[in-house]
């Protein structure tokens, strides 16, 4: 039987990353706490459980849970495209052993770099963006990010958006690992909504 608690947390992680992409693209800034939570998921290689990936607190997924509930009710076309595309890219990643191995290799190197840089430093964001461009982008159709030209022309914003997309892939991988399937998104929305509301009400 599907564990909708874990599935919902992971899906909220995907939605949180998608929402951050939207915020950066339209506003040039994003929810800083949510951004840090999402980036930190990339460092959780051997988590104790699903919640541990997100810092052990459901509160860290507040933005993601809000976004997930909005999405399950069908609002926000850009957002829908982002998180659905992330799930699709993860599916392609899962079928590509070479890409999976390369992603694991690059991710395992991150703690070494963190000895020299903070996770939110430009150098680290550039590194995360490079992993996305080198490993994830070639797997499928490019995710077209829409927003303000003012922000989308900035290299630093490209780094933030791609770092968020990489974090979205991390949550999508987790979603698959805990039993998430596209059929649940299509046919079990009530269960996902009910669980998201239950988790959100406990924050």
Swiss-Prot record:
Give the Pfam families listed for this entry: DUF489
Example of a GO cellular component annotation carried by this entry: cytoplasm
Tell me which UniProt keywords the record has, alphabetically: Cell inner membrane, Cell membrane, Cytoplasm, Membrane
Q: According to its record, how does it sit in the membrane?
A: Peripheral membrane protein
Q: Where in the cell is it found?
A: Cytoplasm; Cell inner membrane
UniProt similarity note: Belongs to the HflD family.
What protein am I looking at?
Answer: High frequency lysogenization protein HflD homolog
């Amino acid at each position: 039987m599907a564990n909708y608690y874990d599935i919902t947390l992971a899906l909220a992680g995907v939605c949180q990353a998608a929402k951050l992409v939207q915020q950066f693209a339209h506003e040039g800034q994003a929810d800083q706490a949510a951004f840090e939570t999402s980036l930190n998921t990339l460092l959780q290689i051997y988590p104790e459980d699903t919640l541990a990936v997100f810092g052990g607190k459901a509160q860290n997924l507040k933005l993601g849970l809000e976004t997930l509930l909005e999405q399950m009710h069908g609002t926000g076309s850009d957002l829908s495209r982002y998180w659905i595309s992330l799930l699709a890219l993860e599916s392609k990643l899962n079928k590509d052993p070479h890409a999976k191995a390369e992603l694991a290799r690059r991710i395992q190197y991150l703690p070494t770099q963190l000895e020299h840089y903070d996770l939110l430093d430009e150098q680290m964001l550039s590194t995360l963006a490079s992993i996305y461009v080198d490993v994830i982008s070639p797997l499928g159709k490019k995710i077209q990010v829409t927003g303000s030209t003012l922000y989308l022309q900035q290299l630093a914003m490209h780094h933030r958006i791609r770092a968020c997309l990489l974090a979205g892939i991390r949550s999508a991988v987790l979603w698959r690992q805990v039993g998430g399937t596209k059929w649940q998104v299509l046919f079990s929305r009530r269960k996902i909504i009910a669980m998201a509301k239950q988790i959100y009400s406990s924050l």
